[in-house]
Amino acid sequence: MATKVITGKVRASFVHIFEPQSVNGSEPKYSCSFIIPKSDTETIGKIQEAVEQARQDGVTKWGGKIPPNLKLPLRDGDIDRPDDPNYTNAYFVNANSNERPGVVDRRRVPITDPLEVYSGCYVRASITFYPFNTNGNRGVACGLQNIQKWCDGEPLNGRVRAEDEFDALDDVDDEDFLN
């Protein structure tokens, strides 16, 4: 059984929600990483409770006990990504799914333009936590359900939008410019 969490305002990263992505030749999946500020104690608390529930649910999958080296989905950005300022003072979870997540705007209107939800924008996410035992790997996974775009943010790829980078040009005669 999976436990669902709806996050508060989190930052999307490594967004692959409109087309599935294959990692190292694996089966293509839809995925997104969610950066959660450490100040969002409500979301972090919900995730910690869901992870604990998944751990308890997993006891039967794991031979009647919780393994000591369990892989857990909630990670500390200050420890796991110390050189990336986007993860400073934040936790993160990587969520994925075999099925395309639902994606809506603030008013719950479906978003179909892949450029509208990008690494760096802010979203709310519906994610689930469940135990797994695959090929000797045991842990709690994070499933991607749905995403609601909250607002735009600075793209994490470092690229600036053209309309933000340039001033408007006056109507100037190009021939005068060349002389």
Residue ranges and their predicted role:
Residues 29-31, 90, 122-124, 139, ...:
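Broad gene-expression machinery/nucleic-acid interaction feature
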Residues 76-112, 117:
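Short acidic, low-complexity segments enriched in Ser/Thr/Gly/Pro
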Residues 1-92:
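OB-fold ssDNA-binding interfaces and closely related basic DNA-contact patches used
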Residues 1-4, 154-179:
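Acidic, gly/ser/pro-rich intrinsically disordered tails
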Residues 107-123, 130-140:
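Exposed beta-sheet edge/beta-hairpin loop segments within beta-rich domains
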Residues 45-47, 104-107, 135-140, 158-159:
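A short secondary-structure junction signal
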Residues 33-35, 94-96, 126-128, 148:
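Residue-level recognition of well-ordered beta-strand positions that form the cores
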Residues 134-154:
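OB-fold/S1-family single-stranded nucleic acid-binding modules
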